[in-house]
Amino acid sequence: MTDFLPFSRPTMGDEEIAAVAEVLRSGWITTGPKCQQLEQAFCQQFGCQQAIAVSSATGGMHVTLMALGIGPGDEVITPSQTWVSTVNIITLLGAEPVMVDVDRHTLMVRSQDIEAAITPKTKAIIPVHYAGAPADLDALRALSERYGIPLIEDAAHAVGTQYRGEWIGARGTAIFSFHAIKNITCAEGGMVVTDDEALAERIRSLKFHGLGVDAFDRQLQGRKPQAEVVTPGFKYNLADINAAIALVQLDKLPAINARRQQLAARYLTQLHSLPLQPLAVPDYPHLHAWHLFMVRVDETQCGISRDDLMAALQTHGIGTGLHFRAVHTQKYYRERYPHLHLPETEWNSASLMTLPLFPDMQDSDVDRVVAALTSILESVRD
């Protein structure tokens, strides 16, 4: 029987196991030296000015928007073609999410759509670097500067991505994810990076109860143990067990992303003759991290719906994903914004399918996926 091929699987080895064992033996397993080392290594690798490790990218988004003072009466512009957490956070803060359409072929938010949505209430713009490719930052930064609106990059898919020769995160404010399926992972975790020192300090406080320091800081830096709450905060700090794994993964990132690029290139070559539509890569200079390999299933061209094709692949022992169902089409937001219509987003939301892509895949795994797709699509055309 052929083994099941998931759409993603973390790449772990003896180095990660040894790193966790080292932390367990140290006696300090929560936020501590490994977390500090991870922040420093992230800055060194990507040219960031400030890096704040957090327990998830969602938590990072929460404290970043809070640090910007976003709340009731404010508006935040972001695409609907994104993971729900961003829009959830905006909503939970009492602000209004202003969801805009994306480019049909790349899924990148377009500067003209953002500009059309700007009002005097707009307090932040959150573009998404999608599937490992970067959004067009020159155009987005120009908007941010022209209107004086903070730009917060959702870089959950973009660790190791470059835009015009510059690492994502080297400038401005960006939020990365270390979730289990991301290019580097520590099971759960994230990193907020920024070149705004004052913003970084507010985020550091908010991610740990609103205190200015954490327990490790108080122990080693000689600060008063009676640390005071500056403003009410949360518990979004990253534990050293997770940070130790992330440090090893960060060191492996160049090899991880290189393998992802090889697998993606093999897919693109072999899928050329099938009626599936892979995402287009942006035409501006960039380095793609290939977090996800996505195709669009147009039922009129393929003779089968996206959902039925996913089910058929499952019978072949092949897993798939859906990244993502548009936020405004989901029950809560559909009822709250019944008249919102985003045609490019809605077409993609109904047709997107993520194929298996992870560094431990063999070339033969790509061949197997393409062979299964070919067989299924030929059978429905007969």
Curated annotation (Swiss-Prot):
Biological process, per Gene Ontology: lipid A biosynthetic process; lipopolysaccharide biosynthetic process; response to antibiotic
MF-aspect GO terms: pyridoxal phosphate binding; UDP-4-amino-4-deoxy-L-arabinose aminotransferase
Annotated catalysed reactions: UDP-4-amino-4-deoxy-beta-L-arabinose + 2-oxoglutarate = UDP-beta-L-threo-pentopyranos-4-ulose + L-glutamate
Encoding gene (name): arnB
GO CC, one annotated term: membrane
Cofactor(s) required for function per UniProt: pyridoxal 5'-phosphate
The protein's name: UDP-4-amino-4-deoxy-L-arabinose--oxoglutarate aminotransferase
Enzyme Commission identifier(s): 2.6.1.87
N6-(pyridoxal phosphate)lysine found at: 182
Pathway: Nucleotide-sugar biosynthesis; UDP-4-deoxy-4-formamido-beta-L-arabinose biosynthesis; UDP-4-deoxy-4-formamido-beta-L-arabinose from UDP-alpha-D-glucuronate: step 2/3; Bacterial outer membrane biogenesis; lipopolysaccharide biosynthesis
PANTHER family, per the entry: TRANSAMINASE, UDP-4-AMINO-4-DEOXY-L-ARABINOSE--OXOGLUTARATE AMINOTRANSFERASE
Family in the record: Belongs to the DegT/DnrJ/EryC1 family. ArnB subfamily.
Subunit and interaction comment: Homodimer.
Organism: Pectobacterium atrosepticum (strain SCRI 1043 / ATCC BAA-672)
Keywords: Aminotransferase, Antibiotic resistance, Lipid A biosynthesis, Lipid biosynthesis, Lipid metabolism, Lipopolysaccharide biosynthesis, Pyridoxal phosphate, Transferase
Function: Catalyzes the conversion of UDP-4-keto-arabinose (UDP-Ara4O) to UDP-4-amino-4-deoxy-L-arabinose (UDP-L-Ara4N). The modified arabinose is attached to lipid A and is required for resistance to polymyxin and cationic antimicrobial peptides.
Superkingdom, taxonomy of origin: Bacteria
